[in-house]
Every structure is written in structure tokens, then in C-alpha cells.
Amino acid sequence: MTDGAESPVAARVRAESRAWIEANWDPDLSLVEWRIRLADSGWACPSWPSRWCGRGLPASAADVVAEELSRAGAVGVPDGVGMRLAAPTLLEHGSDDLHSRLLRPTVTGEITWCQLFSEPGAGSDLAGLTTRAVRDGGEWVVNGQKVWNTSATHADYGLLVARTDWEVPKHRGITYFVIPMDQPGVEVRPLRQMNGHASFNEVFFDDARIPEANRVGEVGQGWAVALATLAHERRYAGMGPAAPSGAAGRATREAGAERAVVYEPYQWYPQRAGRVDLVVERATATGANRDPVVRQEIAQLLALARSAGWTAQRARAARSLGRPPGPEGSLGKLAASQVARAASRVHTLIAGASGMLDGPESPEDGTIAEIFVSVPAVSIAGGTDEIQHNIVGERVLGLPREPDPSHQLPFRDVAKNPSAWRDRPSGDKG
């Protein structure tokens, strides 16, 4: 929230939500039981319509309730693809049927989601995707491959963009779907990363089926829906680490049963790496703070972190005012990438050669090495830094787009020989 006196509406929301949380929060409840109680109250998503776990309040109410949940040490709504991407996209573009079937169980955590956008040949140029969906009666049959998907191993549903028309330019032949993941035609394979983890997956579709009722938006108009999802993704990336209630709103497994247990926030390494207080603490403990080069790197990290913080505040303020995601999300994501890279530099500078070690005898139990190998992903995931620069240049600075006549050709012609268009000077195309 921004500085200044709290509005009467915010004060009322704070008082009412605090009273309800104090009367109802019980850490001995199972996670699902608590989230069902929260959803029934309307405090789960206070700015949503009352029929979908909300209270029809202004968008700013969500931040107030999140603060009150955090103050009480209570669990909030699930944090991840479901609430960050799927729910807002469905609210904006989904049918009433999708709302009634999917919104509430997303809020309670009874269903989970993954995002199925990128392909081996369509990452930054997402509109060049070739996964196809063909109508078959009341269903769509999907064949193709997606990659770099988180949560796909355990997701119930996926947000899928697929090509349904090859005879029109690439942006106009895409349709957006909600695909059930638990079916014979969907195969998920984890991808091993250089840090030893398998946080991402590749997903293969072999005659997978989607009910017509799971289409989001009109046939061939999926690019606009996909842009809405990507805008929400950039907004959250630009807002920085999750708010305390978001970090508190995750669960651990205790004695074999899900319990609403609050755990230490900032456990994702790149986010934790950017905490300047932790960097200063380690530099002081090792004596590296006496090195002027280290002090200069810490000062630069502090400046970048402060700048990123102000950008994140702009993104949060825009959301609280109910504004649609804008270019501040791209600016925030770029700022987060800069902070992560600067943090990686100073951490490895402080640790020296020992920072390359892994295991219990390495600095911070291998955290330094983990930061070093994980941070590059921050500049790629959710849209590369180059894509964010393009968005800022075109939508903030008003710079012209690079000419690309292939955008006017039927995608079938472009897909047959993409290098012929990619390698020729723009003046020779067409």
C-alpha cells in the first residue's frame, strides 16, 4: 500500500476481515477445511463477485485482507499458476460454465494448474506455436509438445494455447483452452536442470481431448486471451516476492496430514538472494565488508533493490486500483532480473572459490552455488529480458515495431520455411 491515511473503505475492510479471521482461524484445521471456510466467507478473494468466493469490494481490499491474514499468521489462498494466472484469465474471458466449475476449487486448492504456452520452437515468438487442436464433434483433439512447464507433474488442469487455423496469419489462428491433464493422451516428462532440480517439465499431447465447454474465448481469438495471461504473469513478477500472506499461505505436510503451517518466506533462492540485509550480514560475518570492491557491489545491489521496490509498489498500486496489467509489469520484471544478477555477483564475490562448492560443508549449505546456477533463469522465465525491453520500447516509449511481413501471411506458408523469412532483410520480405 502507498503511504498516507487509510481510506474509510479500507479501514472498514480491515476491521471486518480482522474480526472474522480472529474468530475463525484455527491452525489445527486441515488446509482444505480452512480454505473452504475462507472461501465461504468471501474474504478469500474480496474483490471478486460474491458468487465466486468474493464480496464485490474494490480491488484494494485484497491487499488489506492479505495484510490481516499475515498479521494473524493465517493461511491465504494458494499461491501459484491457479490464482495468479488461471483465475484472473477465466474471470476476464471464461464462460459462466467455466466460472462455476473451476473458480471455487481453484481458490480452495482442491484443483491445481499449470501453464502450457512455450514450445521447443516457440518461446519468445510464442505466436509461432505449432501444437494443433482439431475439432471432433463436441471435443477438440490436441497433438504437439509444450516445454518449460512448472507444476505439470501434479496439475489437474493446464492453460493451453493451440493452433486451430493454419490458413490465417499466426496471431489469428490460435485458440485458448483449459485441458484436463489426467488423461491417456497427456505425457509429462521432468527436465533435469543444471542445479540438480527438476522444476520444469515437457508435456507431450498424443490425441489428447478437450471438451468444447473448456474453450476460453472465441475460436481463433486465443492470442488476446494469452496476452491477458502473460500480462498477469508479468504483473506478479514485477511485484517482487510474494506478500507475507502469500508466503505464509503455503502448506507443509505434518504427521502425514496436510496442516495449515506457516513457514519462513523468501525460500525461493533468487528472491532470497536479493535481500540486501542477508548480503550485508554475510559480508560482515566473513570480514568481506572491509573490501572496497565488495562494499561497492553491495551499494549497487541496494540501489537496484530500492529501485525495484518502487517499481513493485507501482504495480501493486495499479492492481489495488483495479487497473488492468500494464507495462509496469515488464519494468518490474526487468528490475527483478537486475537485482537477481547483482545479488549473484556479490554473493559469489564474498564467498570466493568456496562458493562453487555444494553440500553441507560449502558456504550456507550450498546456497551460494544454488544462487549462481539458478539466477540466470530469472531473465528468461515468464518472458525474456529482450521481450520486456520490446514491450517497454513500444508501449512506453512509443518506438515502432520491427517490420515483419510474415505476420500477414497464412501461417502454413511461414511454418513450411521459417528461415526464409527470418534470414532475409526486412526490405526483401514480401
Language-model features and meaning:
Residues 9, 26, 149, 330-430:
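Alpha-helix capping/hinge segments and adjacent helical runs
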Residues 186-306, 378, 417-429:
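Glycine-rich beta->alpha junctions and the first turn(s) of the following alpha-helix
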Residues 295-300, 327-334:
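Short, charged, amphipathic alpha-helical segments
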Residues 1-80, 85, 101-105, 112, ...:
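Amphipathic, small/basic residue-rich leader segments at the start of a protein or domain
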